[in-house]
């Protein structure tokens, strides 16, 4: 059925005489019975609102051919062509008569310009439909598929192509439904596709069909002679209805994806190329390759695929053109490998009798190693180069001149290869070792010894580089940086970090080239920058760093080239545009004419502003598309029907209102989300204008009317173009005041106050300006007006806080106290959560000092240092002595251990009997932990049982504690470890080994033998800080002693000292220090 429709469409196209047909005749033909059999709208799957009824209705009230020309033309207008291409240009796959077959009926283009209405806002003359207010008005696109559109659909039957490639297949018949105007120079053989090239789309931008695709146009075309059309009602164009693609129209769908997102949807590009190649459409594949490589000129992978395709097709001339365009600008190992294969293919060595082919191949290898020989993956090229030299005439080790020449070439190649950190450096070194030792062992050792440091450096550097780039994805298909929090942001950040570490590693000069070969060092750094920019093409900071490195190393041309390419890749980048403008401003100081110099400096700013304004337009278009898609979704879910009066009830009305409110809420949320993005772009545009304004002020001053633009002309251009924030007015006013003391600054602030009445930042800067010119009365008036307007809206109350804070600071310093108190009262009413102390202290404080929080030192007791250990409370010496023997109820007998019951109610009933006397042997063999429990229970009372000590004490210490009396029984002075530690802390310790007196006795190799004597009742945490007073204490750090003979103790009699971990004989521990007796 589809073939029958296409055949009918073909006959209809043949019946239409393109030279003499007019729109009236077309309408009559559309109303005839023959044309009723084929209706293009039937193939659109109800995506367009136009119907056959509309086309029949147009017979009664025909519409004009053009909005600006009510009289229809008497003959068809030929399709517009791309001005960038010659008129007779056509791809080899197209026949000369194809353009005639496609020129069925074309919609006329409107060539007249429509003036825009102007109005005055805040004293400035602005356009009526400026972009600042364009979003508030509803856009009404022209009719979709009206009478003209229904009858001007081009119906093309592709003919058999005449191509240089005999293997192209014959395309299937097609009926195009996209537009009425198609450029004959750009027509392609797309089966089942309605693709229109970008050049053709640009050439028909004045037609109503294309205007219907842009819902938020920045300028609404108006014409006084425009007549009302009764053909069809304008219907908003949605993304789904703007194309009308069939499901099997794979090429058209991919083209739509590319047109919507050319820089972000790289998979669509690659799928489209594969689709053409699978269909054996080589010319179409070439065209897509050229478009892709125009957008991504440094994508080496696709250049390699493009060159491989031409090589497989034996298109050697096209292949050479690719090499001429890429080899010197794209340093890629794989691309150069393809080139070397091509050179060896065109210059066979088997039939080379003159040696010309060998010389050509050798020069090709030299050129390749010059450009990509420093790459860490270039080991294959170095290996092939060495093998190529080995295969040359002559014998290694011979005495002839050819033999000597071959030996010299091999030695030179090996010595270059082993200095580069590549994956083949180890194998090349082994081969070089065998080569030198095979010639002459004596001279070979000399050469190897000379080249060994370079080889060791290259080998270790390659290992380091592999560790850095282990997780690196060395792709040349650039990716737009994902927004933080979006899909892929972590992976992209990891790749960026790896590239930056590689660049930092190269700048660190691991191969030690900076001192010996400065040019080689710079070349390696520039090479890695170029490699990084292939993958990070859309990251402006890498372009900036590369250009800055070139400028710092006297490489002006390379730096400018980096900036130029970076701006081409990122035209919306303020960083690169500002850097480029600064370089132009610095390098053009010798230019005497300020107008020419200003034009040169302004060029990067203009490119930046154009790109930003285009982004704003695309954002508005995307917003309209999203809103239309949302409305279409709700329309499909809830179709608009007209119910009868009998079916109306309260439930239906409530459901309808609920659905409408839900739709409006989602649309409002969608618009708010887009408004945030557009607001950021508007802010960026404003600061770009500010940067341009300041640059022009430095070059041309404030300007003169009719003579020199200057900063004032930039301010006028910014206001005329729109989409600026209050920052532009603030910057212009402050330039006028600080640079020229011109009263125009106040006028600019006054006009800005009318345009931005709710901008708190502008109001704050306005107040500061009035205070600077000592106009306090107007400053207070502006303050009251701004605060009253903002406070009237509860949502804007928070915006008044910085304004209150500024005036409060001014009044507290230079105003009246009554004014200050009144301001504080108003601030308490508006901001009750702010503490009163903070408001009061703000009067007397500065950013560097606050006197209200200062606490002066009155007494030395306020600065008493903290003790290292808390002071223990003294124990009463006259307490009641406890019983010598423990309570029988808790005594743990060694014959029958004490049972532990948590529940006192379930304890078994026992009888108390007298304790049997323990023998001495049994007492000594008593379990130490249990004995400890008995002693502690004896001291603390029989009503408590021990919960267990952190660590068990030695058995001898437990026995000692069991036989000595309690400490409360002694009335003599007690040992205070805290005071002793404090005394040691105040002792001047030696800081070097020379201050330590050596002991008189020296044994062995001169190392002192020390005996460690420990005593005292110290907590274990203070070890080893005290000694028995049997000699002069001396402090020796073990870090200054290489050999220490330590005495191991077998018995300890101190109840509070645990045996430390002493180092064995002949070792030392730098972290320990001992107090010893000499």
UniProtKB/Swiss-Prot annotation:
Question: What GO biological process, any one, is recorded here?
Answer: mRNA 3'-end processing
List the Gene3D superfamilies hit by this protein, alphabetically.
Answer: 1.25.40.1040
Give the protein name, as stated in the record. Answer: mRNA 3'-end-processing protein rna14
> Which residues lie within the region annotated Disordered?
15-209, 222-251, 632-663, 851-950
Chief localisation class? nucleus
- Provide GO CC annotations from the record: cytoplasm; nucleus
Q: Where is the composition biased (Basic and acidic residues)?
A: 896-907
**Which purpose does this protein serve, as stated in its record?**
Component of the cleavage factor IA (CFIA) complex, which is involved in the endonucleolytic cleavage during polyadenylation-dependent pre-mRNA 3'-end formation.
Which ranges are annotated Polar residues under compositional bias?
42-55, 82-115, 151-170, 190-206, 879-894, 931-949
Q: Where is the composition biased (Acidic residues)?
A: 126-139
Q: Where are the HAT repeats?
A: 280-312, 314-345, 356-391, 405-438, 475-508, 520-552
User: Where does the record place Low complexity bias?
Assistant: 58-68
**GO MF terms on file?**
mRNA binding
Q: Which Pfam families match?
A: Suf
**Compartments it resides in:** Nucleus; Cytoplasm
From the broadest rank down, the organism's phylogenetic lineage runs: Eukaryota, Fungi, Dikarya, Ascomycota, Pezizomycotina
Taxonomically, which superkingdom?
A: Eukaryota
**What are the alphabetically sorted keywords of the record?**
Cytoplasm, mRNA processing, Nucleus, Repeat
């Amino acid at each position: 059925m589809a073939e029958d429709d296409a055949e009918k469409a073909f006959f209809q196209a043949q019946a239409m005489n393109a030279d003499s047909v007019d729109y009236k005749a077309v309408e009559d033909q559309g109303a005839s019975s023959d044309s009723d059999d084929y209706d293009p709208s039937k193939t659109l799957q109800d995506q367009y609102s136009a119907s056959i009824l509309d086309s029949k209705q147009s017979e009664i009230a025909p519409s004009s051919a053009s909005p600006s020309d009510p009289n229809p033309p008497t003959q068809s207008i030929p399709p517009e062509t791309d001005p960038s291409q010659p008129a007779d240009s056509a791809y080899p796959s197209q026949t000369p008569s194809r353009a005639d077959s496609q020129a069925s009926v074309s919609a006329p283009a409107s060539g007249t310009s429509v003036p825009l209405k102007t109005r005055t806002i805040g004293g400035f003359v602005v356009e009526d439909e400026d972009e600042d207010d364009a979003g508030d008005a509803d856009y009404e696109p022209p009719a979709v598929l009206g009478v003209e559109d229904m009858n001007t659909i081009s119906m093309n039957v592709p003919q058999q192509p005449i191509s240089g490639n005999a293997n192209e297949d014959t395309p299937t018949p097609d009926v195009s439904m996209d537009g009425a105007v198609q450029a004959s120079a750009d027509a392609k053989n797309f089966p089942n596709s309605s693709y229109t090239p970008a050049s053709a789309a640009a050439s028909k931008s004045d037609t109503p069909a294309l205007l219907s695709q842009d819902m938020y146009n920045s300028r609404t075309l108006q014409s006084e002679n425009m007549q009302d059309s009764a053909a069809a009602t304008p219907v908003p164009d949605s993304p789904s209805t703007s194309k009308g693609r069939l499901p099997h129209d794979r090429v058209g769908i991919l083209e739509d994806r590319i047109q919507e997102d050319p820089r972000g949807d790289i998979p669509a590009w690659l799928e489209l190329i594969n689709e053409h190649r699978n269909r054996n459409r080589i010319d179409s594949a070439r065209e897509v390759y050229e478009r892709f490589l125009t957008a991504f000129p440094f994508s080496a992978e696709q250049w390699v695929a493009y060159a491989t395709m031409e090589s497989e097709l034996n298109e050697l001339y096209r292949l050479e053109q690719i090499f001429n365009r890429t080899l010197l600008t794209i340093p890629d190992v794989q691309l150069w490998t393809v080139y070397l294969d091509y050179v060896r293919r065109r210059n066979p060595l088997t039939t080379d009798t003159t040696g010309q082919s060998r010389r050509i191949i050798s020069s090709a290898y030299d050129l390749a190693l010059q450009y990509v020989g420093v790459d860490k993956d270039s080991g294959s090229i170095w290996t092939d180069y060495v093998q190529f030299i080995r295969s040359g005439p002559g014998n290694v080790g011979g005495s002839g001149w050819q033999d000597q020449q071959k030996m010299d070439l091999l030695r030179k190649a090996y010595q270059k290869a082993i200095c580069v950190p590549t994956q083949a450096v180890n194998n090349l070194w082994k081969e070089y070792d065998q080569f030198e030792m095979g010639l002459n062992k004596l001279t070979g050792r000399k050469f190897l010894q000379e080249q060994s440091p370079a080889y060791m450096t290259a080998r270790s550097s390659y290992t380091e580089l592999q560790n850095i780039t282990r997780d690196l994805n060395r792709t040349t298909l650039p990716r737009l940086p994902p927004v933080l929090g979006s899909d892929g942001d972590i992976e992209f950040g990891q790749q960026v970090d790896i590239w930056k570490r590689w660049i930092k590693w190269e700048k660190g000069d691991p191969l030690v080239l900076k001192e010996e070969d400065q040019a080689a060092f710079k070349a390696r750094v520039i090479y890695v920058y170029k490699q990084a920019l292939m993958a990070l093409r859309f990251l402006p900071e890498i372009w900036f760093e590369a250009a800055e490195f070139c400028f710092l190393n006297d490489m002006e041309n390379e730096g400018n080239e980096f900036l130029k390419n970076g701006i081409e890749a990122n035209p919306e980048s303020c960083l690169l545009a500002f850097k480029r403008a600064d370089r132009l401003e610095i390098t053009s100081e010798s230019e005497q004419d300020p107008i020419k110099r200003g034009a040169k400096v302004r060029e990067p700013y203009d490119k930046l502003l154009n790109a930003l304004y285009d982004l704003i337009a695309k954002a508005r278009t995307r917003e309209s598309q999203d809103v239309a898609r949302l409305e279409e979704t709700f329309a499909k879910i809830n179709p608009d029907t007209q119910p009868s009066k009998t079916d109306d009830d309260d439930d239906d009305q409530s459901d309808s209102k609920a659905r409408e409110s839900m739709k409006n809420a989602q649309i409002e949320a969608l618009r708010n989300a887009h408004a945030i993005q557009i607001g950021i772009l508007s802010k960026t545009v404003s600061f770009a204008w500010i940067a341009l304004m300041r640059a022009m002020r430095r070059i041309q001053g404030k300007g003169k009317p009719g003579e020199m633009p200057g900063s004032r002309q930039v301010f006028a251009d910014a206001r005329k173009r729109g989409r600026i924030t209050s920052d532009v007015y603030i910057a212009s006013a402050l330039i006028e005041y600080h640079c020229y003391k011109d009263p125009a600054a106040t006028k600019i602030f006054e006009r800005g106050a009318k345009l931005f009445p709710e901008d708190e930042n502008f109001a704050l800067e306005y107040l500061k300006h009035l205070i600077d010119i000592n106009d306090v009365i107007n400053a207070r008036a502006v303050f009251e007006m701004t605060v009253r307007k903002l406070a009237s809206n509860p949502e804007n109350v928070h915006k008044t806080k910085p304004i209150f804070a500024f005036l409060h600071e001014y009044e507290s310093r230079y105003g009246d106290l009554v004014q200050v108190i009144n301001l504080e009262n108003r601030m308490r009413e508006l901001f009750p959560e702010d503490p009163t102390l903070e408001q009061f202290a703000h009067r007397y404080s500065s950013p560097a000092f606050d006197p209200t929080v200062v606490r002066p030192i009155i007494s030395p007791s306020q600065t008493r240092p903290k003790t290292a250990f808390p002071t223990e409370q003294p124990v009463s010496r006259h307490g009641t002595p406890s019983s010598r023997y423990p309570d029988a109820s808790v005594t743990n007998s060694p014959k029958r251990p004490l049972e532990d019951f948590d529940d006192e109610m379930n304890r078994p009933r026992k009888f108390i009997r007298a304790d049997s006397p323990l023998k001495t042997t049994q007492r000594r063999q008593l379990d130490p932990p249990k004995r400890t429990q008995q002693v502690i229970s004896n001291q603390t009372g029989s009503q408590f049982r021990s919960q267990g000590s952190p660590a068990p004490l030695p058995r001898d210490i437990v026995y000692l504690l069991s036989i000595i009396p309690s400490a409360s029984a002694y009335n003599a002075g007690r040992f205070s470890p805290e005071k002793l530690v404090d005394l040691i802390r105040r002792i001047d310790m030696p800081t070097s080994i020379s201050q330590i007196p050596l002991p008189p006795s020296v044994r062995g190799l001169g190392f002192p033998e020390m005996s460690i004597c420990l005593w005292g009742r110290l907590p274990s945490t203070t070890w080893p800080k005290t000694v028995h007073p049997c000699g002069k204490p001396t402090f020796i750090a073990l870090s200054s002693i290489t050999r220490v003979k330590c005495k191991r103790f077998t018995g300890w009699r101190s109840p509070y000292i645990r045996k430390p971990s002493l180092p064995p004989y002949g070792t030392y521990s730098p972290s320990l220090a001992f107090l010893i007796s000499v």
